[in-house]
UniProtKB/Swiss-Prot annotation:
One Gene Ontology term from the biological process aspect of the record: translation
Family membership: Belongs to the universal ribosomal protein uS9 family.
Keyword Transferase appears in the UniProt entry: no
Name of this protein: Small ribosomal subunit protein uS9
Transmembrane segments: none
Pfam families (alphabetical): Ribosomal_S9
Swiss-Prot/TrEMBL keywords: Ribonucleoprotein, Ribosomal protein
Highest taxon of source: Bacteria
GO MF annotations in UniProt: RNA binding; structural constituent of ribosome
Cellular component, GO annotation: cytosolic small ribosomal subunit
Keyword Ribosomal protein: yes
Gene of this entry: rpsI
Entries under InterPro entries matching the protein: Ribosomal_Su5_D2-typ_SF, Ribosomal_uS9, Ribosomal_uS9_bac/plastid, Ribosomal_uS9_CS, Ribsml_uS5_D2-typ_fold_subgr
């Protein structure tokens, strides 16, 4: 018999996370590494555990994540979004709890493009009066 996975795609900035959830012991692997090894900063590890702690599923689900693009913060946000979507597929009754916490909504903020004639997106050259 095939193992039943629940799937969720999470996105944040330019990072895309594909998350697979199955009943298990609470092991989280990100790109074939333990989550604690993959995310070097504590904030990243904390962000990916938020939906699990909120729903009380920290020790009864195994999570496998494939992620690409973005930096550490964006990837952590993408994993959180993916875990949230996969949890909703796993148990529909969790959706109101997760939406109230704001985990279901995709954070639409993206990097603003650099404009011609400026140093960065909004930074101008220093103005000299004389």
């Amino acid at each position: 018999m095939a193992i039943q996975y629940n799937y969720g795609t999470g996105r944040r900035k330019s990072a895309v996370a594909r998350v697979f959830i199955k009943p298990g012991t609470g092991v989280i692997t990100v790109n074939h590494k333990p989550a604690d090894e993959y995310f070097s900063r504590e904030t990243g590890r904390m962000i990916i555990r938020q939906p699990l702690e909120l729903t009380g599923n920290t020790s009864n689900l195994d999570i496998m994540v494939n992620i690409h693009g973005g930096g550490e913060s964006g990837q952590a946000g993408a994993v959180r979004h993916g875990i949230t979507r996969a949890l909703i597929g796993y148990d529909e009754t969790l959706k109101p709890i997760l939406s109230k916490a704001g985990f279901v909504t995709r954070d639409a903020r993206e990097v603003e493009r650099k404009k011609v004639g400026l140093r960065k997106a909004r930074r101008r050259k220093q103005f000299s009066k004389r």
